[in-house]
Amino acid sequence: MKKYMVVENYKEGCFEEIYERYNVKGRMFPIGLHFLNSWVNKDKNICFQLMESNDPDLFSEWFERWKDLVDFELYPID
């Protein structure tokens, strides 16, 4: 499977709401998108997630579910 680094830039004032949703609904990944690890910097409102998938189009589906709270950047890892 191909690995990807996802950079989540939390929208201003949304940190608490993001984690409230996460605690209720989980990460809301589509089937086929796999979480490996994550690192959060609360002071900078940013999260880095190491992920893998055989279908990069699944990221768009996942991003759509969080777009009201998070802006995403996606980087394939070679």
Predicted regions and their residues:
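A common structural junction motif
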Residues: G26-R27, W66-E73
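Short S/T/G/P-rich N-terminal loop/turn motif that feeds into the first structured element of a domain
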Residues: M1-I46, N54-L58, D78
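Short, exposed beta-strand-loop hairpins at the edges of beta-sheets
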Residues: W62-E64
